[in-house]
């Protein structure tokens, strides 16, 4: 079975002056994948709202203050049944307003992101992510976190295997 590859980036928040976490899976921004899955569901319900509206969790919380993507994070970012926040509502930044979550299962060889769920006060129905699952090699996952935690100008925007995601001017 082919494993997915993960990378993390750092973006300035659209809301305030802090940094947020960007997540790239197999070179694609996860936020774009999620928004595409949600778009059709929102339209089918006849809602005239913009889907998505996500912003990554605080880069500081994810990598420096806590170890969010290894399951050690603030209680505000963990929901019932061990659902970890990947994105929050970009217009408030308040956990639970419109948060995308998933379970993160970790063993010696693999990290699996599964059971994606939207915790939302905005959308009045449950979104379906169709069994979306990502499987990562534990070593590559750890290296991606290491690069994010030890971000320098040289590696801050570099994917764990050296693929350039983007750079600032």
What is each residue range found by the language model?
Residues 1-169:
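Intrinsically disordered, low-complexity acidic regions enriched in Pro/Ser/Thr
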